[in-house]
Amino acid sequence: MAAFFIVVASLAVALLLHWWFKRPSVKHIKGPPSLSFWLGHERVLRDQDNAGDLETKWRREYGTLFRMGGCFGQDVLVVCDPKALEHVFHPSHPYPKSKDAVFILGLFTGKGLGIVDTCLGETHHRQRKILNPAFSPAQLRNSQVIFQQCSDKLVNGIKESFAGTDDTVNVRDWTGKVTLDIIASFRYDFSTLDGQKTELGQAMRHLFTASQANPSALELILVALIRILPDSVLGLLRLVPTREIRQLISVGNMAKKTAREIMASHNEVQTPEGNGDLLDILARARSVGKMQDDEIEAQLMTLIIAGHETSGTSLTWLLYELAVHSEHQSIIRAELKQSNKYDSMPFLNAVIKESLRLHPVVHSLMHTAPHDDSLPLSGGKTLTIPKGQTLLCSAYLYNRLPCLWGDDAEEWNPARFLDKALPVSLGVYANLFALFNWSMKCRIMEMQTILANLILHFEFSLPDGCPEILRFPGSPVVVPVVKGKVHLGSQLPLRVRVLP
């Protein structure tokens, strides 16, 4: 009997080895030499000063698809090839998010649309169908009233904070306040623009920098374990006391508490089918059994954290670029004096598009091949990849490809969105590779309204001494930090002058 088990075990090992060595391999793909079996390139990517600099160097050397090392000797394909990205995100056969991306996002947003993949079929379709009316044209018009009210409070708050007519202001602090207060559309006022300090707002200010600055080798390895551990034991990692997991769970618990308070303060549905804001829609879905309480909490958590953080960060980078290129502020003011319809202002929209291109709020997205597949590449070639292959889909690199955007792809030039049609279409907005395409119209309207109000009332410029602004590496959201002051969290000091 023992001999029989030895034979069976040997046969199983032989079959496993045969499958392993016969499976498609990406070892032949060029890329930077791996620095460590245990850490690959994950440590050097976290240690770089400016997110994207190292990846840009590799892209110039190895092209729009290259191989880098992950933890435990894993091969990770870095992808910014337009054809390959179109294939990965195609709605008919989407690649799912990687297990570590889903796990990390789930810690602070729950199982809302932020992590429910299109490949999950019925769940994704059901959630999208329920939430779509919240982003209808009628609801967007209602939202614009809220955007305007909050942007007016923002303008008044900045003015009242001045001792004179100009001052150096941490713009990141104010953009965070206004985008959080816009959540007052839930009929739940955070009042941060009125000086109220909420526990959640304070925690989110340092959400990504505090938890992900200078990670130890052990912390990187523990997070990388998520990619290879079976789902049945992933929950145990919540008990692992890494800074990142501790911080994200803490913020997630605050967001969940806030989501419950929001729903508890909302009365039963009083609007007819097809009308009402997001809260009405979620309450209606709960009342008819289409959504459970944990799903509703997750949608609110996603909007509170992910929606607030992405919008606030995008506005911050936009104001930074307009401070650097201050001559563009006068062009926007001239447009605003001629029209009150934001969509009819070409330069206002061009600077928004250009800022989202240069500063995608999410640097990259980690996805996994659901099966052995042929990945189409630009130029007509294909690459065979194995099931389970990890792909790092880089929005940062794609949005700076010279073959798409021209020789000045890494420079600020809003005119590119005025002068020519774009050659391919990956994103739903201006060919940009961006997160949360399903709520992009709402996000753009929010940016238009706030930017217009700020530009009409203030002039932005770089402060004395011009501190160096860096893109914080290692964070899922690319937040600005001041060189040498990363420990203070996300910041953007600008000189702000009140216009007469």
Residue ranges of predicted features:
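Conserved cytochrome P450 K-helix/beta-meander segment immediately N-terminal to the heme-binding cysteine loop
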Residues: C393-V424
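Short, small-residue alpha-helix embedded
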Residues: T310-A323, I450
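N-terminal membrane-proximal hinge/A-helix region immediately C-terminal to the signal-anchor transmembrane segment
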Residues: A3-G112, D117-R126, R141, V145-G157, ...
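Cytochrome P450 heme-binding "Cys pocket" and the immediately downstream C-terminal segment
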Residues: L193, S326-H328, V428, M440-G484
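Cytochrome P450 heme-thiolate monooxygenase catalytic core
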Residues: K97-F108, N142-L315, I331
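Conserved cytochrome P450 K-helix E-x-x-R motif and the immediately C-terminal K′/meander segment
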Residues: V44-R59, G63, N340-G379
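C-terminal helix/juxtamembrane-tail motif
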Residues: G484-P500
